[in-house]
UniProtKB/Swiss-Prot annotation:
The record marks 129, 345 as: Interaction with tRNA. It is found in: Cytoplasm. InterPro entries: MnmA-like (IPR004506), MnmA-like_C (IPR046885), MnmA-like_central (IPR046884), MnmA-like_central_sf (IPR023382), Rossmann-like_a/b/a_fold (IPR014729). Keywords: ATP-binding, Cytoplasm, Disulfide bond, Nucleotide-binding, RNA-binding, Transferase, tRNA processing, tRNA-binding. Its EC number is 2.8.1.13. Residues 99-101 are annotated as: Interaction with target base in tRNA. This is tRNA-specific 2-thiouridylase MnmA. It comes from Streptococcus equi subsp. zooepidemicus (strain H70). Catalyzes the 2-thiolation of uridine at the wobble position (U34) of tRNA, leading to the formation of s(2)U34. Disulfide bonds join 104-201.
Length: 374
């Protein structure tokens, strides 16, 4: 029996990119009552006075007109500043390396936007994320990795709750990126050949150091080896992340071998950046971590232990872990030592194809001793 989707209203978050354009197109073709909404989260007028959001909104309007759906623009600049950007700055201020995309999804795209969509009479919201939604016989929603393994975005969606997922659709989840491009080209969408946006949304193509220095004053300090050798000056702890190789300016200085130099630690109180030679430098290896802001995609007990796999950064293979959860905190013990576990980044849990949720890394440990990462 065919279902009548025309009575189901879906509000699509449209960015002006090809993914969200095809999302709207597919839902329209499936008979849903579709409305497109462009979110303006950041005043991104560049040094030439060109606002890229204006260009993106024009693309949204062109696509919406092509596929025959109404569209609106909503301004979330204040919400974004308060809930995402202030968090981003606070994390850098405390020597950590945040992932603003995780917080943007949690607070803006699936909270502020979801709330706004409800005022438009939405039954669901949809975005162009590469993830899959599966509903079981009890009505519980499971979030699965996107079919396109190279594009899977469940890592960035790991802070979504069951309540948020119940109202969410990911129409691209079963497609390869190449198929999405082909659909856009076949339909002659205005965004079919538009290149994907890269980097953090509010920085765009700007130089990261320059951008950050507008908001946080850089404090130069000493760059040291773990055994106390002074290697020169660092530009400010906030500019470096654990495991980073480039940008240290000490490539010519050797320490007995020809291995490259890496950031292996930070001491915020002394404003010291620690460096060491070798990709697997012992200071970069850890055996467990503490995380907070733990969020599971399904209802779970307040306290439990879980054996699963985890990712500690976006583009890395899963690693086997044991997770000890207590309310919104967790201790994650690794089956094998892990490299460059970075406070502020997301740790995300998986059971096979299913994303179970995740948290934010607070501290890494090596055999029970804290690593000097902040």
């Amino acid at each position: 029996m065919m279902t009548d989707n025309s009575k189901t209203r879906v509000v699509v978050g449209m960015s002006g990119g090809v993914d969200s354009s095809v999302t709207a197109l597919l839902l329209k073709e499936q008979g849903y009552d579709v409305i497109g909404v462009f979110m303006k989260n950041w005043d991104d007028t560049d040094e030439f006075g060109v606002c890229t959001a204006t260009e993106d909104y024009k693309d949204v309007a062109a696509v919406a007109d092509q596929i025959g759906i109404p569209y609106y623009s909503v301004n979330f600049e204040k919400e974004y500043w308060d809930r995402v950007f202030e968090y981003f700055l606070a994390e850098y201020r405390s020597g950590r390396t945040p992932n603003p995309d995780v917080m943007c999804n949690k607070e803006i795209k699936f909270k502020a936007f979801l709330d706004y969509a409800m005022t438009l009479g939405a039954d669901y919201v949809a975005t162009g994320h590469y993830a899959q939604i599966k509903r079981d016989e009890n009505g519980v929603v499971h979030m699965l990795r996107g079919f396109d393994k190279g594009k899977d975005q469940t890592y960035f969606l790991s802070q979504l709750s069951q309540k948020q997922l119940q109202k969410t659709m990911f129409p691209l989840g079963h497609l390869q990126k190449s198929e999405v491009r082909a659909i856009a080209e076949q339909a002659g969408l205005a965004t079919a050949k538009k290149k994907d946006s890269t980097g953090i949304c509010f920085i765009g193509e700007k130089n990261f150091k320059t951008f950050l220095s507008h908001y946080l004053p850089a404090q130069k300090g000493r760059m040291m080896t773990v055994d106390g050798r002074d290697m020169g000056e660092h530009a400010g702890l906030m500019y470096y992340t654990i495991g980073q190789r480039g940008g240290l300016g000490i490539g010519g200085q050797q320490g007995g071998d020809n291995k490259p130099w890496f950031v292996v630690g930070k001491d915020l109180s002394q404003n010291i950046l620690y460096v060491g030679q070798g990709f697997y430098h012992e200071s970069l290896m850890s055996t467990s971590l503490d995380a907070s802001v733990i969020q599971f995609t399904r209802e779970v007990p307040e306290e439990f232990t879980l054996e699963c796999t985890a990712k500690f950064r976006y583009r890395q293979p899963d690693s086997k872990v044991t997770v000890h959860v207590k309310k919104d905190k967790a201790k994650v013990v690794f089956a094998e030592p892990q490299r460059a576990i970075t406070p502020g980044q997301a740790v995300v849990f998986y059971d096979g194809h299913e994303c179970l949720g995740g948290g934010i890394i607070d501290m890494a440990y090596k055999d029970g001793e804290p690593c000097q990462y902040i």
